[in-house]
Amino acid sequence: LKKAKEIGVSFTAYIAGVLAFSIEKTCKNKVPIAVMIPVNLRALYPSKTMRNFVTFVRVIFAPSSFESVEACAIEAQRQIKVLTAKDKLDAFISTTVKAQRNWILKVVPLFLKTAILRLGRLFMRSRQTIIFSNLGNVVSPQSMGVERYVLNMNVSKNNTQNLGAITTNGKTTLAFTRAIKETLLPETFFAELQKQNIAVK
């Protein structure tokens, strides 16, 4: 968090920047890297629902973005700010609600809707490189005796590695969930953090 503040970005943007920089170092093909970041909508739209009330923002790093970790973090911050602006989110939610209320969609058989949704998900997955989720600070009663939490992200054959972050007792745990044996990305990521003088255990 201290390093993020030094360059004027959020913790989420900083880690997304380090992650994208690390992916670029481990990839042979120089193509845009898309980091998907969940955004908690409760802060903007008060809700009592127990369901997931999130949307995703896609932060895209062009091959020309990778001058340094700092440059990647600043670019991540810029895109997150634009993509999470209330007017952008209002428009997204409005479009989603209109689609759900569309009478044509109401008469379409469920099996057809399910098939279309699956195709949509496949298309979205093809446009993402990795998911990074920061759950933020979690406070537990001392009586629970919890020293740390670990956030394990879901993976799939299309999304073989994801990164989760969670903070408790002033310490942040960053954990990669992998569906593959190769450890090059996690090793590169944590090495980059150490290069930035961030203690890694």
How should each PLM-predicted stretch be described?
Residues 1, 15-16, 187:
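Generic structural signal for individual residues within well-ordered alpha-helical segments
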Residues 1-9:
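Flexible, P/S/T/G-rich "lid" or insertion loops adjacent to the active sites of thioester-utilizing
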Residues 11-20:
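Short amphipathic alpha-helical segments
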Residues 24-201:
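Acyl-thioester-dependent acyl-group transfer interface
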